[in-house]
Amino acid sequence: MRHYPVMLNEVIENLSLKENSIVIDATLGAAGHSSFILKQIKKGFLIAFDQDKDEIDKSIETLSQIGNNFSVINSNFAEMKDKVKELGYEKVDAILFDLGTSSMQMDDITRGFNYHEEAILDMRMDRRTKLTAKDIVNTYSKEELLRILKEYSDEKFRLPIVNNILKYREKKEIETTIELAEIIKS
């Protein structure tokens, strides 16, 4: 299934690319944006980051059909500065961040992001990491869960949600996406 990037024309226009631009795509995903960037920078270089090895393999194949002036790094963009220097670049011309969970990750129930279908709670962007959403909801303290919801969401009902999680896990471990969704809704 072909992936169509969101707001492609606006993104390309606002990056103000030149043929020799050095560009970072901090969140490669299915290479939707990067494919179009690579077509614009024939004498430049694209450096793309992603944590999701499944997507990286497909994206390299896609980008290779356009050119070879790119490098894909299986890493979180938090390591961008060091990784870009390792490639020999001191500065870049543009950086794209397309943040969030991809539709491919949501559609793949084995990833544990989709709360419309029964699946094991996983929610890891990088499957090499050990910590899953199941681990977090079942072992983190009330304070830790509240902190996560405060820092990473705009959830105004975080206290009742956390209290529901704590109450539920007294009886049984939370294992699936549907269980968690029902706990949150209750």
Put a short name on every predicted segment:
Residues M1-S186:
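S-adenosyl-L-methionine-dependent methyltransferase catalytic core, i.e., the SAM/SAH-binding region
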